[in-house]
C-alpha cells in the first residue's frame, strides 16, 4: 500500500491529476523546489523535502534529495527486518512511490546556449532517486513517464495497489531511460567519434505494422540526441508508413539534397530508378519519370523544391507510394490529398548524417558517412570533356553513390537515363545501364574499372565521357582504350561502394 510519495518533476503535465488522486487516497506527498511550489499553489497538501531531511537545498539546487532520509526510505526492503529496524532507529520513513522526470538535457544540448549552461541540465538528484526506486521496485513504484500516470491511478483505484509486473516494467523503463540519458551526456562530453562504449540513444516514435517482410516485427526510433531529416518530417496525408517506406524516403531525400538545382528522384527498393534536373518541379518530375517509366510505378518520388500544383497533377496520374518534399503549395496539397492512400511527407530538415551504423550478428559497425564526392577531378585522357559533359559527370557521380554496388549510371542532359546496380561484377550493370539509357553521352561508376571491358562497351554504346574513381592496377588499360576511341575520362580519387 502506498503511504508516502516523493514527487519532483521538470515536466509538470498530468502531475496535478496524479497528486490530487494520491492526496485523496491519504498518501503523504514530499516534493522539492518548483514542483513543491506548483503543488502548493494548486491547493495540494505537500511537505518540502528539506523539512524531512533537516537540510536546506544547497549549491543552487544541485543538492536537494541526496540524503539518507530520502534514499534510506526508498531503498529499504520492506521484508528485511534488519533494513526496517535500521530506518526506524534512524527516524527514516519509507517512501513507496517516486515520481520524477529529468532535466531536459536532450533538448537543451541542441540549443544555442553556453557549454556551462548545458552542463547545468545534467540531472543528478533525479537519476539517483529513480535508480534507487527501480532497484527496489518490489516495494517502490517509480514513475518517469507521464503516459504511465493513468494506468497507475487506475490500478490503485481498482485494487488499492500497483501490480508487481507493472512495477517491474516501470523499473525497466528507468534503466532504459537512463541508458539513453547517460549516452547523450557521454557523447556531449567525450566528443569522440569512436568511443570505447557505443551509446547512441534513440527513442521509439511508433510501432510499425511489420518489417521488411510481413513476418518480421518492426518499430521506428528517432535519435534522442541531435537532428536529422528522418527525425523531423511531417506526414500530411496517406496510410501509415512502413519500414520499407522510411528506408526509401531516407535515400530519396539524400539524393535530391545533393543538388542546388531543382531535382527529382524516383526510387524503388532503396535504389534510384530515375533522377533528373529540371527548370521547375513539373519539368524535373517528368524527366525523372522518363528515365524509367516502368519502375517508378509504386515507387517514391522526392523533390528538393516546393511542389506546386502542376507537378502534383502530373504525379497523381500514376500510383505512387510516397511524395516527399520540403513543402507543398496549398493547391498542390489538395491535389495530392485526392489520393487518400498516397503518403505525402514534408521534410523539415536537410540530411545531416555524419556517421552510419550497420548491425552485424552480435556486433555493430560504425563509419563516417559518405559525404565527400571527389578528391580531385583529374582528366587522364588526351581528350578533355566539354563543360556540358563535365556537368553531367558530376551529376552522375552524385547519383551513382546511392546505387547498390557494383553501380553504373549513364547520363544525358542532367538526367540519369540508365541506372544499373547491385551486381557482383562491373560489366553487367554497365551493360544494363547503357541498354536502358540509349543515347546517353556520359557514364559514371562508383568504383574503378578492373579491366578495359567497360570502355569497350561504352564505345559500342556511344558514350563520349567517363567519370570513375580510378585506382586499379589496370587503369592504363582503360585510359588507352579511351584514347583509342576518343572518349574523355576523369578520375576522382574517391570510391563510393554501397552495400
UniProtKB/Swiss-Prot annotation:
Record's keyword annotation contains Magnesium: no
Keyword Hydrolase in record: yes
Comment, domains: The IMP cyclohydrolase activity resides in the N-terminal region.
HAMAP family cross-referenced by the UniProt entry: PurH
Protein name: Bifunctional purine biosynthesis protein PurH
InterPro entries for this protein: AICAR_Tfase_dup_dom_sf (IPR024051), Cytidine_deaminase-like (IPR016193), MGS-like_dom (IPR011607), MGS-like_dom_sf (IPR036914), PurH-like (IPR002695)
GO molecular function: IMP cyclohydrolase activity; phosphoribosylaminoimidazolecarboxamide formyltransferase activity
Residues annotated as domain MGS-like: 1-144
Keywords from the UniProt entry: Hydrolase, Multifunctional enzyme, Purine biosynthesis, Transferase
Native source species: Clostridium acetobutylicum (strain ATCC 824 / DSM 792 / JCM 1419 / IAM 19013 / LMG 5710 / NBRC 13948 / NRRL B-527 / VKM B-1787 / 2291 / W)
Pathway this chain belongs to: Purine metabolism; IMP biosynthesis via de novo pathway; 5-formamido-1-(5-phospho-D-ribosyl)imidazole-4-carboxamide from 5-amino-1-(5-phospho-D-ribosyl)imidazole-4-carboxamide (10-formyl THF route): step 1/1; Purine metabolism; IMP biosynthesis via de novo pathway; IMP from 5-formamido-1-(5-phospho-D-ribosyl)imidazole-4-carboxamide: step 1/1
Matches recorded under NCBIfam families: PRK00881.1, purH
Family assignment from sequence similarity: Belongs to the PurH family.
Top-level taxon: Bacteria
SMART domains, sorted: AICARFT_IMPCHas, MGS
Amino acid at each position: 500500500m502506498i503511504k508516502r510519495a516523493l514527487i519532483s518533476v521538470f515536466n509538470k503535465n498530468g502531475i496535478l491529476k496524479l497528486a490530487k488522486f494520491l492526496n485523496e487516497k491519504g498518501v503523504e506527498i514530499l516534493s522539492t523546489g518548483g514542483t513543491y511550489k506548483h503543488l502548493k499553489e494548486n491547493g495540494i497538501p505537500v511537505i518540502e523535502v528539506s523539512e524531512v531531511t533537516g537540510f536546506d537545498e544547497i549549491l543552487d539546487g544541485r543538492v536537494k534529495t541526496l540524503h539518507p532520509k530520502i534514499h534510506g526510505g526508498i531503498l529499504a526492503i520492506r521484508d528485511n527486518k534488519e533494513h526496517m529496524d535500521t530506518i526506524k532507529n534512524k527516524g527514516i520513513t519509507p517512501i513507496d512511490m517516486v515520481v520524477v522526470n529529468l532535466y531536459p538535457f536532450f533538448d537543451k544540448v541542441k540549443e544555442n546556449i553556453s557549454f556551462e549552461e548545458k552542463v547545468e541540465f545534467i540531472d543528478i538528484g533525479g537519476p539517483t532517486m529513480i535508480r534507487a526506486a527501480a532497484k527496489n521496485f518490489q516495494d517502490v513504484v517509480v514513475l518517469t513517464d507521464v503516459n504511465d500516470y493513468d494506468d497507475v491511478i487506475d490500478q490503485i483505484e481498482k485494487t488499492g495497489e500497483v501490480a508487481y509486473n507493472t512495477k517491474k516494467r516501470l523499473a525497466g523503463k528507468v534503466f532504459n531511460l537512463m541508458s539513453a540519458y547517460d549516452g547523450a551526456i557521454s557523447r556531449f562530453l567525450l566528443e569522440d567519434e569512436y568511443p570505447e562504449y557505443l551509446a547512441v540513444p534513440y527513442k521509439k516514435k511508433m510501432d510499425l505494422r511489420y518489417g521488411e517482410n510481413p513476418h518480421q516485427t518492426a518499430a521506428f526510433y528517432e535519435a534522442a540526441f541531435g537532428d536529422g531529416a528522418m527525425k523531423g518530417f511531417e506526414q500530411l496525408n496517406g496510410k501509415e508508413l512502413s519500414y520499407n517506406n522510411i528506408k526509401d524516403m531516407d535515400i530519396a531525400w539524400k539524393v535530391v539534397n545533393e543538388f542546388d538545382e531543382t531535382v527529382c528522384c524516383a526510387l524503388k527498393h532503396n535504389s534510384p530508378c530515375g533522377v533528373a534536373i529540371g527548370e521547375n518541379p513539373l519539368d524535373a518530375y517528368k524527366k525523372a519519370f522518363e528515365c524509367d517509366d516502368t519502375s517508378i510505378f509504386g515507387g517514391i518520388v522526392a523533390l528538393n523544391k516546393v511542389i506546386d500544383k502542376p507537378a502534383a497533377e502530373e504525379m497523381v496520374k500514376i500510383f505512387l507510394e510516397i511524395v516527399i518534399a520540403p513543402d507543398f503549395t496549398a493547391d498542390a496539397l489538395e491535389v495530392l490529398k485526392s489520393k487518400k492512400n498516397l503518403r505525402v511527407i514534408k521534410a523539415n530538415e536537410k540530411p545531416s548524417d555524419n556517421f552510419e551504423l550497420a548491425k552485424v550478428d552480435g556486433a555493430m559497425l560504425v563509419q563516417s558517412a559518405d559525404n565527400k564526392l571527389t578528391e580531385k577531378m583529374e582528366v587522364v585522357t588526351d581528350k578533355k570533356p566539354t563543360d556540358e559533359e563535365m556537368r553531367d559527370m558530376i551529376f552522375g557521380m552524385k547519383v551513382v553513390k546511392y546505387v547498390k554496388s557494383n553501380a553504373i549510371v549513364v547520363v544525358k542532359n542532367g538526367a540519369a537515363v540508365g541506372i544499373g546496380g547491385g551486381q557482383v561484377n562491373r560489366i553487367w550493370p554497365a551493360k544494363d545501364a547503357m541498354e536502358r539509357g540509349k543515347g546517353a553521352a556520359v557514364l559514371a561508376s562508383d568504383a574503378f574499372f578492373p579491366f578495359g571491358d567497360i570502355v569497350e562497351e561504352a564505345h559500342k554504346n556511344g558514350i563520349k565521357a567517363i567519370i570513375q574513381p580510378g585506382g586499379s592496377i589496370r587503369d592504363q588499360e582503360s585510359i588507352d582504350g579511351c584514347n583509342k576511341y576518343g572518349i574523355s575520362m576523369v578520375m576522382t580519387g574517391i570510391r563510393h561502394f554501397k552495400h
